Amino acid sequence: MMKKILMILALMGTLTVEAQRMDDVTEHSKYIKVVDEYVPAPGQYVNLMPTFETGDTPATMAQKCTEMLANNEKGLVSLGGYGGFITFHLDHSIANVEGQADVMILGNLSGEGNSEPGIIMVSKDENGNGLPDDTWYELKGSADVDSVGKVVYGYSITYHRPVSETHTGETGGISKYITILNYILWTDNQGGSGYLYRIADSLNPIFRGDPYYPMWITDDQMTFGLQTLLPPNGYNTGDYKKEYWVRNSLAWGYVDNKQNGNTAACSYDFDNAVEVVSRTPVKVDFVDFIRVYTAVNQQCGWIAETSTEITGAEDLHLDTSIQRIKDALAGVESIKKETTINGELYDLQGRKIKAPGKGLYIKNGKKYIIK
């Protein structure tokens, strides 16, 4: 019987090797190592942060993002309008530590009333190929609780390349900053449609007349989905003479939603992982890839589209992540002594243990260490 248990254990240990990643480096870093994907939706900053240059491709733009964000460089990357996303990984899997926030992701919120919320997705490299092509789960936020009936799950949007970059001129009134009103057409899977408008380059000194559609994308359409659409958070509190836009922060759970100095509000717990559409909770032990996307589809006067920005991310418990990876590679799962364990436990001599204390045990062919 014991030989059978150990054989099952050995097989399980082999399978778990591919699911945890730890690069061969002298010293592990808690910061981003590589940006795997950068696919922004159209927006006023997408060809500027990072800067597009003739000849750039999806790969070179992702590399530019890496140079701006890796190793805590604190550069600024814009994700454009709704759905635009960035995917990154560290030099190791991030462990899900029970009862604690696991990752901090920073935006560029300048103050209250300027929230541009982004949703976080997480994935585990289950097939072991080092690519972000496995199942993705969402980290739910406060809108699941306080905006019931206002959130759209399974939302999809398609942007169409503009037919012209020719400015139509100032339109007057509350839209006096708009130079192309019907600029970039969007359609969604809810029967909705509309246009991103273009604002005057004079509004921002960094503008250089670039298109809002990503210039390295060769397709004439960009589709993002199936994702979650948060309700609008932007309101014009001014009048017809002067706009004053406020974009209210959500309670918790979103990137670029609170100021970076608020560490707790910029920290996120893998225990909040859910399936995107059904919202079924998912237990995630390790995360290899993280994705952030702009979660609202709105335009706010002279501010134009709401676009999530990213300035960095870090593992909030580096040492624990590394130790748990080592345990997993050895076929050992760490659990707390107070954790309820369903099923029978055996010690390494094959004896059934009714009241386990701290130590190493076997359950269903897998090793557990109780700390």
Model-found features: residue ranges?
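Bacterial Sec-dependent N-terminal signal peptides
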Residues: 1-20, 332
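A domain-level signal for the mature, folded cores of soluble proteins
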Residues: 20-116, 140-328
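Acidic, glycine-anchored loop motifs typical of Ca2+
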Residues: 126-135, 151
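Residue-level detector of functionally pivotal "anchor" positions at catalytic/ligand-binding pockets or at interdomain
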Residues: 322-349
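C-terminal tail/sorting-segment detector
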Residues: 360-371
